[in-house]
UniProtKB/Swiss-Prot annotation:
Keyword Hydrolase among UniProt keywords: no
Organism taxonomic ancestry: Archaea, Methanobacteriati, Methanobacteriota, Stenosarchaea group, Halobacteria
MF (Gene Ontology): structural constituent of ribosome
HAMAP family from the UniProt entry: Ribosomal_eS1 (MF_00359)
Keyword Ribonucleoprotein attributed: yes
Protein name as catalogued: Small ribosomal subunit protein eS1
Length: 206
């Protein structure tokens, strides 16, 4: 390929400004290049909550978005995942204490299926029954939150720390806690995907 052809390709490449979803105030996530708009779809973009909010104290929260729509020079994303950094989670671990985690798959009021992973850290070592009670409380509160909220509101309550605070206030009555976090949240299926799965399940049953 000649230098002229390569130069022409570079000139034709367009840059798209990538925007966060509405629940993150359509914040600008950066730019991505492509020859055609179709190439931009499904690309993922990672950032931190600290970068979105211009708050370095929130850099331990990683966010992943996926491009779902493309305009003339703008790419719009959907939320895919929220995750705390390994270094931050490791810093919460103390010798002689207990770490209690759970994996909860829930359906929001607008039919998004989400996996939520809460984790609690005790002040001292808890026994097995206390750990089970804490885990049960975490699961119950995550399920209640999903049953009462849309996908956007659930994600907002997780990212802003309201859900972890609610779990902390409830679970600390079982055993003294030092910290509760939602260590990871992942979108598993959109309403369209959930509906398709349910339809396929009905067909199999028939």
């Amino acid at each position: 390929m000649s230098e002229r052809s390569v130069s022409k390709q570079k000139q034709e490449k367009r840059w798209y400004t990538v925007m966060a979803p509405e629940i993150f105030d359509r914040a600008e996530l950066g730019e991505t290049p492509a020859d055609e708009p179709e190439q931009v779809y499904d690309r993922t973009v990672q950032t931190t909550l600290g970068e979105l909010q211009n708050d370095p104290s929130e850099n331990n929260t990683k966010l992943t978005f996926q491009i779902s729509d493309v305009g003339s020079d703008t790419a719009y994303t959907d939320f895919v995942q929220h995750e705390l950094t390994r270094d931050y989670l490791r810093s919460l671990t103390r010798r002689g204490t207990s770490k209690v985690d759970a994996f909860v798959t829930v359906l929001t009021t607008d039919d998004y299926r989400v996996q939520v992973q809460p984790v609690a850290y005790t002040t001292k070592s808890a026994d097995r029954s206390q750990e089970q009670a804490i885990r049960s409380t975490m699961v119950d509160l995550v399920e209640e939150s999903a049953a009462d909220n849309t996908f956007a509101d659930l994600i907002d309550s997780i990212v802003e720390g309201r859900l972890s605070s609610a779990i902390y206030n409830e679970a600390k009555t079982i055993y003294p806690l030092r910290r509760v976090e939602i260590q990871k949240t992942r979108l598993q299926a959109s309403p369209e995907e959930v509906a398709a799965e349910e339809e396929a399940s009905v067909d199999v049953d028939d």
